[in-house]
Amino acid sequence: MPGKRGGGGGIDIGLIFAHKILTVLLLLSTVGWIVAFIGQCAAEAGSGGRQGVLWFAIFLQLFLIVAKYLLVMTDSLGTHRLQLTTFTSIALVFSVIGINSGIYSSNSSEEAVAAGWFLITLTNIVWLLFLTTEEESALYPIVNIANDGVTPPAARTSGRYNGGGGAGGQSMRMAGGGAGTGLGGAGYAAGNGSAYSGGFQGGAAGGYQPAFGNSPSAADITTANGTGLGAPKMSSAASVRSRAANDTATGGVGGISQDAPSVASHGAPASPAQPGAKGSELPDYGYKARALYAYQANADDPTEISFSKGEVLDIVDNSGKWWQARKSNGETGIVPSNYMQLL
């Protein structure tokens, strides 16, 4: 069952049953909440005594249960991972207090309160493991062992950054790794394929002149001897595994040049014209991988491709969070590595 992408992708009730572990957790927490709520009402009305802070706890837990249902149905767990983890941790403390308030009592209503909060405590602990487990952790494949469509929280928050610069925002992926500083500015490319590259251009004026283009990747900034001086580069998903040859270019004053295509006067990008520049080589799909889960490509990012569970794809390189892949019908794009298993 393909999962819908979060962030306004609509509600899909079927996603509740797509992840078997989450299905069990949601059902157990619902049953536990009902038992605890009825027990607290009976204890408050009878001889069980006042429940005090547990009334705050029971409604906090209700808020969490409803929120988890909605986030699973919209496949938005990763987007709200931090908030959900924080409130679940708070609720875990109160659930332990709920157990302690009635576990040693001989009153049946208070025993029901303890039983209900015991179920809630178990689910809260597993939820915290699910929300905080990173992809590199040994627990990651365990908590996602029966997933058939729900995007794990760690998969959405690692290696991907969402900006709110426009309608719907822009999505950018880190291609170069860590942050740093350098002489030559930085190159950025948004998920829609448009690129911005900043650099220092030589000449008498010696000013800073930005260049714009529709290149799938940011401009490379090199010195006359080929040594890169650029700051961290951010490239579009289409250039995650670029096979472009290394060019040695001679710059103007200062020895710095840019390979990115410049913009013509009518807005169309002019083709790069550098003497001796080599053309890009075709990517070599040297690996094959099978999809562990179904995946629905983000409609706002044309570089992603969808695939079904069990589908075999050709892979260019198996490093990084996102792999350049080719489907059997010839469609190419990028896929999340945590959804794939190399053959």
Swiss-Prot record:
<feature type="transmembrane region" description="Helical">
    <location>
        <begin position="53"/>
        <end position="73"/>
    </location>
</feature>
<feature type="topological domain" description="Cytoplasmic">
    <location>
        <begin position="1"/>
        <end position="20"/>
    </location>
</feature>
<dbReference type="InterPro" id="IPR035522">
    <property type="entry name" value="Sho1_SH3"/>
</dbReference>
<feature type="region of interest" description="Disordered">
    <location>
        <begin position="231"/>
        <end position="281"/>
    </location>
</feature>
<feature type="topological domain" description="Extracellular">
    <location>
        <begin position="42"/>
        <end position="52"/>
    </location>
</feature>
<keyword id="KW-0728">SH3 domain</keyword>
<feature type="topological domain" description="Cytoplasmic">
    <location>
        <begin position="74"/>
        <end position="83"/>
    </location>
</feature>
<protein>
    <recommendedName>
        <fullName>High osmolarity signaling protein SHO1</fullName>
    </recommendedName>
</protein>
<keyword id="KW-0472">Membrane</keyword>
<feature type="domain" description="SH3">
    <location>
        <begin position="284"/>
        <end position="343"/>
    </location>
</feature>
<dbReference type="GO" id="GO:0005886">
    <property type="term" value="C:plasma membrane"/>
</dbReference>
<keyword id="KW-0325">Glycoprotein</keyword>
<feature type="topological domain" description="Extracellular">
    <location>
        <begin position="105"/>
        <end position="111"/>
    </location>
</feature>
<keyword id="KW-0346">Stress response</keyword>
<dbReference type="GO" id="GO:0030833">
    <property type="term" value="P:regulation of actin filament polymerization"/>
</dbReference>
<feature type="transmembrane region" description="Helical">
    <location>
        <begin position="112"/>
        <end position="132"/>
    </location>
</feature>
<feature type="transmembrane region" description="Helical">
    <location>
        <begin position="84"/>
        <end position="104"/>
    </location>
</feature>
<dbReference type="InterPro" id="IPR036028">
    <property type="entry name" value="SH3-like_dom_sf"/>
</dbReference>
<dbReference type="Pfam" id="PF00018">
    <property type="entry name" value="SH3_1"/>
</dbReference>
<feature type="compositionally biased region" description="Low complexity">
    <location>
        <begin position="235"/>
        <end position="245"/>
    </location>
</feature>
<dbReference type="GO" id="GO:0000147">
    <property type="term" value="P:actin cortical patch assembly"/>
</dbReference>
<feature type="glycosylation site" description="N-linked (GlcNAc...) asparagine">
    <location>
        <position position="107"/>
    </location>
</feature>
<comment type="function">
    <text>Plasma membrane osmosensor that activates the high osmolarity glycerol (HOG) MAPK signaling pathway in response to high osmolarity.</text>
</comment>
<comment type="similarity">
    <text>Belongs to the SHO1 family.</text>
</comment>
<comment type="subunit">
    <text>Forms homooligomers.</text>
</comment>
<feature type="transmembrane region" description="Helical">
    <location>
        <begin position="21"/>
        <end position="41"/>
    </location>
</feature>
<dbReference type="GO" id="GO:0005634">
    <property type="term" value="C:nucleus"/>
</dbReference>
<dbReference type="InterPro" id="IPR001452">
    <property type="entry name" value="SH3_domain"/>
</dbReference>
<keyword id="KW-1133">Transmembrane helix</keyword>
<keyword id="KW-0812">Transmembrane</keyword>
<feature type="topological domain" description="Cytoplasmic">
    <location>
        <begin position="133"/>
        <end position="343"/>
    </location>
</feature>
<keyword id="KW-1003">Cell membrane</keyword>
